[in-house]
């Protein structure tokens, strides 16, 4: 499942 927040970097989604 993908989060609503989609950052440019996949690793940035950890925050």
UniProtKB/Swiss-Prot annotation:
Keyword annotations from UniProtKB, A to Z: Calcium, Thiamine pyrophosphate, Transferase
Q: What is its EC number?
A: 2.2.1.1
Keyword Transit peptide listed: no
Where does the UniProt annotation place the signal sequence? none
- Give the GO molecular function terms: transketolase activity
Catalytic reaction equation(s): D-sedoheptulose 7-phosphate + D-glyceraldehyde 3-phosphate = aldehydo-D-ribose 5-phosphate + D-xylulose 5-phosphate
Cofactor(s) demanded: Mg(2+); Ca(2+); Mn(2+); Co(2+)
Q: How is the cofactor bound?
A: Binds 1 Mg(2+) ion per subunit. Can also utilize other divalent metal cations, such as Ca(2+), Mn(2+) and Co(2+).
In terms of domain of life, where is this protein from?
Answer: Eukaryota
Report quaternary structure and partners: Homodimer.
Function according to Swiss-Prot or TrEMBL:
Catalyzes the transfer of a two-carbon ketol group from a ketose donor to an aldose acceptor, via a covalent intermediate with the cofactor thiamine pyrophosphate.
Q: Which family does it belong to?
A: Belongs to the transketolase family.
Q: What is this protein called?
A: Transketolase
- The organism of origin for this protein: Populus euphratica
């Amino acid at each position: 499942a993908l989060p609503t927040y989609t950052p440019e970097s996949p690793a940035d989604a950890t925050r």
